Each structure stands twice: as structure tokens, then as C-alpha cells.
Amino acid sequence: MYKILSSFVAGVAIGSGLVITYVLYNVPEPPELDLQRWWGIGTRPTEEDKSIRPFSIDFNDTVILDLKERLKNRRPFTKPLEGINSEYGMNTEYLETVLEYWLNEYNFKKRAELLNKFPHYKTRIQGLDLHFIRVKPEIKEGVQVLPLLMMHGWPSSSKEFDKVIPILTTPKHEYNIVFEVVAVDLPGYGFSEGTNKPGLNPVQIGVMMRNLMLRLGFEKFYIQAGDWGSQCATHMATLFPDQVLGLHTNMPLSSRPLSTVKLFIGALFPSLIVDAKYMDRIYPLKNLFSYILRETGYFHIQATKPDTIGVALTDSPAGLAGYLIEKMAICSNRDQLDTPHGGLENLNLDDVLDTVTINWINNCIVTSTRLYAEGFSWPEVLIVHRIPSMVPTAGINFKYEVLYQPDWILRDKFPNLVRSTVLDFGGHFAALHTPQALADDIFASAVQFLKFHDRKRNQKSS
């Protein structure tokens, strides 16, 4: 009997081990996707409009007047508790100063002029009008021009890149490369149209972005992205490795099951997972989970009931400002909760109010927050997360990025991680906060991408 029981236990152990190994290391087949799926109103027309139309940003007088009237007529806010700064969320006394600035000092017309300093366009992709900026560099002899698609996250738009675009499109004496930049508003964000159909998740947005680049004549291209843009970009690199030549992300993350196991192994043996210098960005896990629990309330609302929170934010510019500004502040420096500004003073106030204004005038807060619900409710997203991307990838981790993963975890998703940078400054909105550091890393990473492809060609020819 003992031998039978021992054999049974051994069999269960072996079987369990095989199942666990399969779950951790199995690479599923890519999902079958309709690469021309229609996201516009109604059904696909016989002939689709493929024109590329110049576009100009306009904060018109009627919209500005309505906004200012709403701000003037706002109800008094409840004051913060005694001794509380930003620990409970947006400090309403500080918010009052921001709203007064927005009402009386923010120059709507001048800000629109600044936003229009780049060439803006719209084109219809799979039924939705997508807005994008396209900036061509000065071409000098001996300098290679690399097409670069840039994608933002929530609650941003292509405006987030207005400080980094001039750096990327200007040749640098230490490099023989420069970028032609296409900075796009994700569907439902900024000046891009949102869909009226469910299912427009990061995988499907990746398909749309690939089709946008094809529309613009780029068969192959590079990508830079953060936040939701990074998720979409990672899926593009996974699904279209022959078209994406390199991926640079300021929010590199692996969601493969093995990565989760490694995270928990690190709780017992942290030195196996992460360099001692950066250990406090992950461990102890109780601190990480406490931070996640504290700061992701908005995430849970938007991933479950985006339309409900959208009702409040659509009708009140003061409410919209408080909601967006609090998240932009904490994601710029989460160590400043004990200040009235909560981290906001790491960013230029006009830049922050540009984002709030763009969300307000386009009434896009609902369509943008719906991405949180779509991003976690479709099997195809989970499938693509589990497939390694073979595209050469570079990651940069700023100090106050929302989540940090060391290279040993990142390589689960990105086996060809050709460059990894960890900085002791900066935050989630890197292009606004630290544009020079971001641009420098993009240039350096592009060199590594080119070397990767050179090695690959040499291996094929030998």
C-alpha cells in the first residue's frame, strides 16, 4: 500500500510539474485578426476614404466662453482635512489656484498656436479619423533618416511629445541618424475619433497603428511609446516583427506568467532578480502592493465602469482638472504626497493644462478611459501578452515610473533586449518631464537597433 501511495504522490508531483512548466513556458499561436476590421459607425462603405488631410488645432471662442462660465460657477470645494496635503487625493486648496490660473491666465489662443507649430493631419483608418503630427527632419548628407512612430498613454495625446520632437528631428553631431516622427493620438484620445463598437483593445489599436504607417508609406519603422501606447507598441512588435524594426519604451513590462513567478521568487531571494541599487523599486513586495493598492483606484473604476465616471468628468471642467491633474502629479513623483501639489510642480503647468483642455474641448474622457475596460476583457490581449517579441527592444526606467521590472524579467517578453537604462530621476510622463534624457536614450537605442540588424544580415550571409 505504501508503495502504491508513494507512486501516486510521485505521479501527481510529476504531473503538476509538467502542467506548471507548460503554463509558464508555453508560447501560444498568435490570434487570427481581421487586419481591416471596421471601427466606424455602421458598416464599411464600398470605397473607403484614404485621403490625408491637413488639420489645425482650434480652441474656439464658443468653447472657451462655455468653459470659463463653468469654472466661474463652480461650487465651493470641501477643504482638506487638518494636516492632510495630497494623501487623500487632489488637494482642493491647491486645485483652486490651478483653476484660477486656467480661468484668468492660461492663454488659450497662444497655446493653440504653440500646438500648431508642427504639421498636423487626419486620415481615416478602419472607419475612424486618426489625428497625427508628422515632422520631417533636415536631411544632411551621410545622415540616415529613421521613421519613428510615437504613441502616448492616458490621459495624454500627441501633445505630450511637443518638447521631444524637435530634439529627435534635429541631426546630432555624434550620430549619423535622425528621425522622421509620426506622433499619433490613439483612437478616442485627443483629436482622434473614438469608436462606437466594443473590442477596440490594445491589440486592435496596434493593428490600426500599423495600417496608419502603411498609409503614410512606411513598410518598416521604429516605435517609441509609454503607458497604453507601450502596450499597443509591444503587441505590434509581437504581431508584426517584419515591419517593426525596433521598439523603445519608457514603460517596459512583461506580463508573461513566468515573469510573475520570478517576481515572487524575488521576495525570497531579491538579489537573484534585481540589482541592489534598485531593490527598493520592487521589494519588499508589501511596499509595492501597498503602493499599487493606494494609487490604482482610478484604474479599477476605469477598467470596470468608465462610462459612470465619465458622466461626472464630462460635465465639470473643475472635476476633470482635479481628476487628471492628481494622476499626472503622483505619476511624476509619488514621494511628494505630503505636499499640496502632490508632485505637480515637476511639470510645467501650461503643459498640464494643455492636456486638460484637449480632453475638455474634445469631450474624449469617456472614449479614452474605455481603453482600460477593453484592455483587460478580450482573450486576444492575454494571448499576445504570452508571446515573446523577437523585435530588438530598448527600455528606459525613470525613477518614478509606475512599475519597474529588471532585465531578467523583461527578457521573458523581450529576448532581444539590446539596451536597458535605469535613471534616478524622472517619472511617468517622460516626454514632458525629461525630454532631453528621453531623446538621448532613443538615439542611443536606435544605434543598437541598427547594429542588431547588421549582425542578423551578416549571420544570414555567412
UniProtKB/Swiss-Prot annotation:
Keyword Metal-binding in annotation: no
GO biological process, one term: catabolic process
Topology class, membrane: Single-pass membrane protein
Record-annotated membrane-spanning stretches: 4-24
Listed GO MF terms: cis-stilbene-oxide hydrolase activity
Membership in a protein family: Belongs to the peptidase S33 family.
Domain of life: Eukaryota
GO cellular component: endoplasmic reticulum membrane
Active site per the UniProt annotation: D227, Y372, H428
Enzyme class: hydrolase
One Pfam family this sequence matches: EHN
Subcellular location: Microsome membrane; Endoplasmic reticulum membrane
InterPro entries in UniProt: AB_hydrolase_fold, Epox_hydrolase-like, Epoxide_hydro_N, Epoxide_hydrolase
Protein name: Juvenile hormone epoxide hydrolase
